[in-house]
Amino acid sequence: MSFSLSWTLNGSGGNCDNPLWDDVEIKLLALRNIHGTITLDIHDNDTGPQMLQIRAEAGNYLVMLGEIVSDDYEVRAYYNKKSTAEMVCILGDYWPNNQIITDFSFVTQVISEFFHTGNVQKNLLS
Protein backbone atom coordinates (compact mmCIF):
# COMPACT_ATOMS: atom_id res chain seq x y z
CA MET A 1 0.00 0.00 0.00
CA SER A 2 1.35 3.40 -1.00
CA PHE A 3 0.64 6.38 1.30
CA SER A 4 1.39 10.05 1.42
CA LEU A 5 1.49 11.99 4.68
CA SER A 6 0.69 15.69 4.97
CA TRP A 7 0.47 17.89 8.04
CA THR A 8 0.04 21.36 9.45
CA LEU A 9 1.33 21.84 12.99
CA ASN A 10 0.84 25.22 14.65
CA GLY A 11 0.75 26.91 11.25
CA SER A 12 3.66 25.23 9.46
CA GLY A 13 3.27 22.16 7.32
CA GLY A 14 4.72 19.72 4.88
CA ASN A 15 4.25 16.38 3.19
CA CYS A 16 6.10 13.21 2.28
CA ASP A 17 5.47 10.17 0.13
CA ASN A 18 5.75 6.60 1.39
CA PRO A 19 6.17 7.45 5.09
CA LEU A 20 7.31 4.87 7.62
CA TRP A 21 5.25 4.38 10.78
CA ASP A 22 7.97 6.31 12.67
CA ASP A 23 7.35 9.34 10.39
CA VAL A 24 3.62 9.23 11.11
CA GLU A 25 4.13 8.72 14.84
CA ILE A 26 6.52 11.69 15.09
CA LYS A 27 3.94 14.00 13.47
CA LEU A 28 1.14 12.52 15.57
CA LEU A 29 3.04 13.09 18.82
CA ALA A 30 3.82 16.65 17.69
CA LEU A 31 0.07 17.21 17.14
CA ARG A 32 -0.77 16.27 20.72
CA ASN A 33 -2.24 19.27 22.57
CA ILE A 34 -1.53 21.79 19.77
CA HIS A 35 -3.59 22.82 16.75
CA GLY A 36 -3.19 21.32 13.32
CA THR A 37 -3.96 18.44 11.00
CA ILE A 38 -2.48 15.16 9.86
CA THR A 39 -3.71 13.45 6.70
CA LEU A 40 -2.77 10.01 5.39
CA ASP A 41 -3.79 9.40 1.77
CA ILE A 42 -3.77 5.96 0.13
CA HIS A 43 -2.58 6.21 -3.48
CA ASP A 44 -3.43 2.81 -4.91
CA ASN A 45 -7.09 2.34 -3.89
CA ASP A 46 -9.83 3.00 -6.46
CA THR A 47 -12.54 1.88 -4.03
CA GLY A 48 -12.74 1.59 -0.28
CA PRO A 49 -10.78 3.77 2.15
CA GLN A 50 -8.96 6.72 0.56
CA MET A 51 -7.74 8.89 3.43
CA LEU A 52 -7.70 9.43 7.18
CA GLN A 53 -7.55 12.93 8.61
CA ILE A 54 -7.09 14.14 12.16
CA ARG A 55 -7.96 17.75 13.05
CA ALA A 56 -6.82 18.93 16.46
CA GLU A 57 -7.11 21.92 18.75
CA ALA A 58 -6.84 22.29 22.54
CA GLY A 59 -6.77 18.55 23.24
CA ASN A 60 -9.85 17.92 21.08
CA TYR A 61 -9.47 15.62 18.07
CA LEU A 62 -11.78 15.05 15.10
CA VAL A 63 -10.92 11.89 13.15
CA MET A 64 -12.48 11.27 9.72
CA LEU A 65 -11.99 8.46 7.22
CA GLY A 66 -12.99 9.11 3.61
CA GLU A 67 -13.86 6.14 1.42
CA ILE A 68 -15.49 5.30 -1.89
CA VAL A 69 -18.50 2.99 -1.52
CA SER A 70 -20.58 2.10 -4.60
CA ASP A 71 -19.18 5.09 -6.54
CA ASP A 72 -20.09 7.50 -3.70
CA TYR A 73 -17.63 9.27 -1.42
CA GLU A 74 -18.57 8.68 2.22
CA VAL A 75 -17.01 9.94 5.43
CA ARG A 76 -16.84 7.88 8.59
CA ALA A 77 -16.15 9.51 11.94
CA TYR A 78 -16.04 8.72 15.63
CA TYR A 79 -19.44 8.87 17.33
CA ASN A 80 -20.05 8.86 21.09
CA LYS A 81 -23.78 8.32 21.62
CA LYS A 82 -23.41 9.18 25.34
CA SER A 83 -22.02 12.65 24.62
CA THR A 84 -23.94 15.86 24.02
CA ALA A 85 -24.44 17.42 20.60
CA GLU A 86 -22.99 20.74 21.87
CA MET A 87 -20.74 22.29 19.23
CA VAL A 88 -16.93 22.42 19.62
CA CYS A 89 -14.66 24.66 17.54
CA ILE A 90 -11.68 22.98 15.89
CA LEU A 91 -9.60 25.08 13.49
CA GLY A 92 -12.44 27.55 12.91
CA ASP A 93 -15.13 24.97 12.14
CA TYR A 94 -17.80 23.80 14.58
CA TRP A 95 -18.36 20.08 15.13
CA PRO A 96 -20.78 18.16 17.37
CA ASN A 97 -19.17 17.22 20.68
CA ASN A 98 -20.29 13.62 20.13
CA GLN A 99 -17.76 13.39 17.25
CA ILE A 100 -14.85 14.77 19.31
CA ILE A 101 -12.19 12.53 20.86
CA THR A 102 -10.19 13.68 23.89
CA ASP A 103 -8.37 10.36 24.45
CA PHE A 104 -5.07 10.65 22.56
CA SER A 105 -4.40 6.89 22.88
CA PHE A 106 -7.62 6.25 20.93
CA VAL A 107 -6.48 8.64 18.19
CA THR A 108 -3.14 6.79 18.07
CA GLN A 109 -4.93 3.42 17.84
CA VAL A 110 -7.07 4.61 14.91
CA ILE A 111 -4.23 6.09 12.84
CA SER A 112 -2.03 3.05 13.54
CA GLU A 113 -4.76 0.69 12.35
CA PHE A 114 -5.28 2.76 9.20
CA PHE A 115 -1.55 2.88 8.47
CA HIS A 116 -1.02 -0.86 8.99
CA THR A 117 -4.23 -2.21 7.40
CA GLY A 118 -5.54 0.53 5.11
CA ASN A 119 -8.83 0.66 7.00
CA VAL A 120 -10.36 1.24 10.45
CA GLN A 121 -12.90 -1.00 12.14
CA LYS A 122 -16.45 0.34 11.82
CA ASN A 123 -16.98 0.04 15.56
CA LEU A 124 -14.25 2.71 15.96
CA LEU A 125 -15.30 5.00 13.09
CA SER A 126 -18.88 4.56 11.89
Please state what every model-predicted region is.
Residues M1-N33, D44-P49, N60, M64-S126:
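Acidic, proline/glycine-rich low-complexity IDRs
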Residues G36-I42:
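A short, Trp-centered hydrophobic/proline-enriched beta-strand micro-motif
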